[in-house]
Amino acid sequence: HHSGFTDDRHYLWAATLDTSKIFIFDVHTNPNKPKLHKVITNFVKASGGIVGPHTTYALPGRMMISGLSNNQDFGGRTALVEYTNDGTYVATYHMPHDENLYGATKTGQIADGYGYDVRALPRRNVMITSSFTGWNNYMMNLGKLMGDSEAMKRFGNTVVVWDLHSRKPKKVFDVPGAPLEIRCAWGSQNNYCFTTTALTSQIWLIYEKDGEWNTESVATIGDPAKIPLPVDISITADDKHLWVNTWNDGMTRVFDISDPHNAKEVYTHKIGDQVNMLSQSWDGKRVYFTSSLLANWDKADGPEKMPQFFKAYHYKDGKLEQQFAIDFLKEKLGLPHQMRFGAYSLYAKSPKDGAKVAELSK
């Protein structure tokens, strides 16, 4: 499902939501020919029952993995799981919930113990997690899920701010409607992050003020009544704009976040029948999109006649211009979900002769 580089960019960790296996690829020895280095098959046992590893996030010498579920009831209560770069289990850090807050302060009405994404701001000694749903829900057919009123109650509604050094949760915030991807500002003085809620179509700001962390809804995405279903987001390198993809209507949107407390939509563009992840170049001139959300949730077909794709665009004068597209079903490539790009220039190492390395994108 998702993948992430280790801090030295030598290995790419790819996690699976159903089997809970984690595949570690050597992408350093020969970038032209990534090689399977190791498979972690005992994630559930080692972690104490965590199921559905999602985000594989690099910390110094470590990989922090966010779980989505557990092997007791396969619901949404879960944890963060830490490994060394070579794949050795370190520790499990449970998400705070009403029965055990693990020392955290509940700032609102909810402490559900759910998880999804994880990001960190080391300069502020902060780690942030969001919340989605458990194995029972994400493995269910989407139509069946939407028609099950009880299942629809089992989505996360919280964001948690952690102490990065101690790995202990500090504050639990009410962010209703399944907050998904977390993206943090790039500027060294910009101590804030964004997330979007899949079920309520809101952009939320997670920010520090006077040494305390807070959350605030700062914009509405499309028409929430039509369930556009915001998924991936990406902040431009100058911290002035936020890209937001909405899976259900296949749109991408750009919001002006020059004032992060007052986000304003400035551009929309139809990408396809559905759209999920995006990645943009550091200079902001290229944006890439993929289509698949989850195999059991994806649309079978639509007017665009290309339900599963990778599409590349130039972004110039505030508008997208498509350059090419790859039909993943036609090419029998499977379901395209996430992209990861790397650049030798960032790590001061020249590529080997003949190696073709993609430009760094975020």
Could you say what each language-model-derived stretch is?
Residues G108-R253:
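Beta-propeller domains
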Residues T6-H10, S66-T78, S130-R154, T290-F310:
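Short, conserved, GDST-rich strand-edge loop motifs in beta-rich repeat architectures
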Residues V27-N30, T84-T88, L164-R167, E208-G211, ...:
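Short loop/turn segments that connect beta-strands within beta-propeller blades
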Residues S20, V27-L121:
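Asp-box/WD-like beta-propeller blade repeats and closely related beta-sheet repeat scaffolds
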